[in-house]
Amino acid sequence: MKRRLWLLMLFLFAGHVPAASADSACEGRFVNPITDICWSCIFPLSLGSIKVSQGKVPDTANPSMPIQICPAPPPLFRRIGLAIGYWEPMALTDVTRSPGCMVNLGFSLPAFGKTAQGTAKKDEKQVNGAFYHVHWYKYPLTYWLNIITSLGCLEGGDMDIAYLSEIDPTWTDSSLTTILNPEAVIFANPIAQGACAADAIASAFNMPLDVLFWCAGSQGSMYPFNGWVSNESSPLQSSLLVSERMAFKLHRQGMIMETIGKNNAVCNEYPSPILPKERWRYQMVNMYPDSGQCHPFGRSVTRWETGKNPPNTKKNFGYLMWRKRNCVFL
């Protein structure tokens, strides 16, 4: 009952929150949990290796057997369940140049002031660069709507702010960032970055290549795990890049767990310090909600950015992050 009341309040509140006014550089709107969501992106839905419902976007591998036997606490020791796979809306991201601008909530937090203000600039070689802040929200939409009822197959809880880059010194300082991604130096060369062309092509026609984990497809390089973007050609593209970096960063920090679409392994969740790119999708929800489609990580924005990236915007963006979940419905 409490969850339904919370959802009703969200629905009534959505669309009635004025754009952030405390900061003239901040703009946003509350995400409507019904009308702003691409509900077809939850598909395909699978039972074992069988597709129960088809989807428009490519799917990952699933367990071959629909019936799984999983460990259980005493006195049961073993439980039998159905192996299901679906795409779960599990997080929202704000991307902004204005510190404290909560794009997906529609207001600004004045406490941050001008700390680590985002920017766009050119270096001495006249190369475009920019800096963005990212906020990560826990957004367990399937739990609110009771779409999936097994606790082992959904992200529970309420909407919550899980991460603010403004209070993370590694997000603004590239030297500190190396603490989280010391391997970045290995891939900071033309050969490694040239290999990212293969990831961009794979993302454009199917799914990204997990083996090229340092690549963000058409968006550029996953490293470093901070808000600095070099060679910026499009603010919208940069906003996607830093959102994907944040997903990688939270995986590295152990804040996001991963499921595996294999027999037996499907019973549990596991830490994954390397981002499984093929198991993630994104959908724009701010400033121009796109409830008709979602896209694999790394896919070029040229397919859908028309009308969503005008030059007179204040460079504030919001995305809904979808994650593939394989689990055992008990």
UniProtKB/Swiss-Prot annotation:
Pfam families in the record: TraU (PF06834)
Main location: periplasm
Signal peptide: 1-22
Gene Ontology CC terms, in alphabetical order: periplasmic space
Domain of life: Bacteria
Disulfide bond sites: none
Protein's cellular compartments: Periplasm
Record keyword Signal present: yes
Xref: InterPro entries: TraU (IPR009649)
Key words of the record: Conjugation, Periplasm, Plasmid, Signal
General function of this protein: Appears to be more essential to conjugal DNA transfer than to assembly of pilus filaments. Required for F plasmid conjugative transfer.
Note: May be part of a periplasmic complex containing other proteins.
Name under which the protein is recorded: Protein TraU
Organism field: Escherichia coli (strain K12)
